[in-house]
Design a protein with these regions (language model features):
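Short alpha-helical packing/oligomerization segments
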Residues: 63-94
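Intrinsic N-terminal pre-sequences and regulatory tails
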Residues: 1-8, 137-138
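Juxtamembrane boundary at the C-terminal end of a transmembrane helix
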Residues: 125-138
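Hydrophobic cores of alpha-helical transmembrane segments in multi-pass inner/ER membrane proteins
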Residues: 9-18, 49-51, 77-87, 122
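Juxtamembrane helix-loop boundaries in multi-pass membrane proteins
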Residues: 34-51, 71-74, 104-122
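Long, highly hydrophobic alpha-helical transmembrane signal-anchor segments
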Residues: 45-67
Length: 138
């Protein structure tokens, strides 16, 4: 269905941009304002949930009848990016409440190497899925 195709592209694009926002805002200064809006807790939660739900939906609703695996790659990437976003949000809020600022600052400074790579993968999956809609694994 065309709706799931569009939702898959949009969810992967936004989730990938959200995860790799630090890297993208350094490279592309014109996107800094948009990426700052996506870095809020509510935006990350909604984007993560949307990526997971759309990823699950595109697994069960194929794009065309002969393509069984047509949306496999974007679906898996969308679910992975969504899980990473939700894990990041819930890790910040649930594990480290506001009464422990020193420990929270130390954890916030630790490098999250997976964020940029997984975000770039989600971004690339969205772009490839947009330009190559009827390929077997895209």
């Amino acid at each position: 269905m065309l709706q799931f195709y569009f939702l898959s592209v949009a969810a992967n694009f936004l989730a990938g941009a959200t995860l790799s926002g630090d890297w993208m805002s350094e490279r592309f200064t014109s996107l800094a304002r948009l990426l700052a809006a996506l870095s809020g807790r509510r935006a990350r939660t909604v984007t993560g949930l949307a990526a997971i739900l759309v990823g699950l939906g595109t697994l069960f609703v194929p794009a065309a009848p002969p393509l069984v695996l047509g949306d496999l790659f974007p679906s898996i990437v969308g679910m992975a990016v969504g899980i990473a976003l939700l894990f990041e949000v819930f890790k910040e809020e649930a594990v480290f409440p506001g009464d422990q600022p020193a420990r929270g600052e130390r954890i916030a400074k630790t490098p999250r190497a997976y964020r940029t790579a997984l975000g770039a993968l989600g971004f690339a999956a969205a772009v490839l899925h947009f330009f190559l809609p009827e390929r077997l694994f895209l």
